[in-house]
Amino acid sequence: MNAIEAQHLKHLTHWPDEIINAIASVEEAEIYMKAGLKPARIGNRWALVRSDINWSDYSVRRNTWLKNKLADYSKWVDYNNADLIGEGFPPRDVNGDPYELHHIGQRQDSPFAELTWAEHMGDGNNTILHKAGKESEIDRQQFEHEKSDYWKARFKAFSPSELRKIYGK
């Protein structure tokens, strides 16, 4: 993305420079804008976060196929999305699919974007977000730890009023 495009994107979105500078193309930015993502500081990193996750929702009970996958199914049966992220796991959409974290700019220290699978990999987005032929700079083992830490930090970012709304107390 050239300087004029970056300046225009900043004017449109008001995203911080750390996010703008990590975005490689206008097409990439459009994916994040179409998803309605907003900037937030989560832990020690900038991220583009979703506002449409229902933190009170998601019951493992609705997805009985998980009984066969989880040895400790009974532990998770009453967890909602907020509980999941508090444990370091991604929240789930209404279908039970996990939201994904994407490194904006594909560098280890890049800001994250919270995306659905379709936003991340579907409809040609995979080739926009992951440049073909370019070696990934992401250490996958480190990323596994970062994802867990990110979701825990996302939970800690809830305000007391948000927690009351989630848990109805």
Tell what function each PLM region has:
Residues 1-99, 105-169:
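Nuclease and nuclease-like effector domains acting on nucleic acids or nucleotide cofactors
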